[in-house]
Amino acid sequence: MPVDLLADLTAGALEDAARRRADRPLSAVEAVAAAQAPPLPALDALAPADRVKVIAEVKRASPSRGDLAEIPDPAALARLYETGGASAISVLTEERRFRGSLADLESVRAAVSLPVLRKEFIADPYQVFEARAAGADLVLLIVAALEQRRLAELHDLIVELGMTPLVEAHTADELSRAFDTGAKLVGVNARDLSTFELDRNLFGRLAERYPSDVIRVAESAVKSAADVAHYRAAGAHVVLVGEALVTSDPVATLSEFRGV
């Protein structure tokens, strides 16, 4: 039987969070979170416009592609993303397979004026408080990794802390579960996180299910301006892009993508 990569990644993220919690209890993280400047209004930054908006990702590696880029200075890359016209920045904080960290998020937050997303396998409230303490404005929630009650609890906690949940789905059922939380920023990931297989046309099949007041985000399989155009034609308001940016001149690539 193949390994369920999403379950494996989520379990690992929880183990790592428990280790951090042993060194830094929740009360300490809550205190730092409370002292942060208010989160930036991500829904405004990502609101539908004449052209597709881009969430640009700081991404060193992935289970499907292995190492992508060293990125010794995430803040410098984030500044290039901002220069290139990104509307928000995603920072991988998963340590084991994506080679990210909360320190990456903190450095990016200090470097740019754009909303910043914590891209992580979130399954515990401690991780949400960590995100706010590190300066995150958005937090990813993956429907497939969470029971509905926990998904709703985490969604509500993110909102309570002033941040914006990006709720990610991969099937019609998961999309319905995302909408049931009240999320206003919902993504369809072309990559099945259990197998890491891609279905580039998935977003187009699911886009018509979105309520009119929910921002539509297309995730994965964006390698070229043609891919951005494909998602735009299917109804995407926002695309999330990682590999294509970290393996190219990010300013030039963003300019090309934003011209679609």
UniProtKB/Swiss-Prot annotation:
Its EC number is 4.1.1.48. Pathway: Amino-acid biosynthesis; L-tryptophan biosynthesis; L-tryptophan from chorismate: step 4/5. InterPro entries: Aldolase_TIM (IPR013785), Indole-3-glycerol_P_synth (IPR045186), Indole-3-glycerol_P_synth_dom (IPR013798), Indole-3-GlycerolPSynthase_CS (IPR001468), RibuloseP-bd_barrel (IPR011060). Keywords: Amino-acid biosynthesis, Aromatic amino acid biosynthesis, Decarboxylase, Lyase, Tryptophan biosynthesis. GO terms for biological process: L-tryptophan biosynthetic process. One of its GO terms (molecular function) is phosphoribosylanthranilate isomerase activity. It catalyses: 1-(2-carboxyphenylamino)-1-deoxy-D-ribulose 5-phosphate + H(+) = (1S,2R)-1-C-(indol-3-yl)glycerol 3-phosphate + CO2 + H2O. PROSITE patterns: IGPS. Pfam families: IGPS. Belongs to the TrpC family. HAMAP family: IGPS_B (MF_00134_B). NCBIfam families: PRK00278.1-1. This is Indole-3-glycerol phosphate synthase. The gene is trpC.
